[in-house]
Every structure is written in C-alpha cells, then in structure tokens.
Amino acid sequence: MDKVVEEYGDIFTSPTGVPLHCQNKHPIDLTLGAPLPNGSIYRRSVLENDEIKRKIQELLHKGHIRPSSLPCGSLIVLVQKKDGTWRFCIDYRALNKITVQNRYPIPRIDDLLDQLKGEKYFSKIDLKSGYHQVPIEPSDVWKNAFKAKEGLFEWLVMPFGLTNSPETFMRLMDDVGP
C-alpha cells in the first residue's frame, strides 16, 4: 500500500476545511448558568512557543480552526512524545465539567472480538485524524475556544479531549458501518 501511495501520491490530498459531507456534527451542550473556562496562558520556553505557533498556523491553513473573539477559552498543553516531537493538546477539563454527558453506547472490546470468531477475512482501516472529519455543530463552535499567545481560536472540527467526542465518533461509525 505504501508503494501505491508513493507512486500515485499526487492523487492523495490532505483534507482541508470543514468536511461538508458529514451529517454527524458534534454538539457541545452546556449546563445552564455555568461559568466558561478562562485561565491564564502558561509561561513557556521559546521552543514550545515556536511549536505552538507552527501548529496554530498549520490548523488555520487546514481550516480546522479560526480566530475567535470570545473573551475566554481553554488552555494549550504541549506533551513531548518519545521521539522528541510535540503533541498539541487543549486542556478541556473545565469545559468538560460543565458539558452535558451524551450516553450513546460504545461497544466493549471483548464483545467486538467475540463477533470475529470463526471469520476468515479481516480488514483494517486507519481513520487518520478521524475526529477532524467531524464538524462541530455551528452554533456550538464558540464553546471550544482556546487561548494562545497568538490570540484566541476555536475549532471548526472535533478536537481530541472534548467530553462526548468518542460517542459522536461512534455514532458516525455506526452510521457508515454495516
């Protein structure tokens, strides 16, 4: 497969913008009257600030985020991976505490494995950046704002770390699955 992608790489594009075909949108329903998260930006090294700036530019270019005018937002957390690169995360713990829980069922791994007994053929797909294929409900986009030294931004697609993201993604998989 890698050979095919390498040979015909010009036909494989990196998706940009908000997926227009996706009927499943991620809502962010908040507890009425709850205060929105509004922490102070963390002090960081020059290297970390450069990485945050690079990642924000990449996400803006892809159309996954946009500038926000909301006066509050969650904070960025950088986590260094084993290979020395950085994982860009948003600390949504405060937002998640005031988000109404979605109880869409997520199957147990052992139940899924039981369904495979006796089967002869298996396939595997890589849902690269799968969450980024799910748009945020347009009326809820402002709720997932985050702060950076460069300004305030909000996700147009579902980021990792939000309460109910696994349930939204499972619903999408159920809709496209068998």
What are these regions (language model features)?
Residues 1-178:
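Retroelement reverse transcriptase polymerase core
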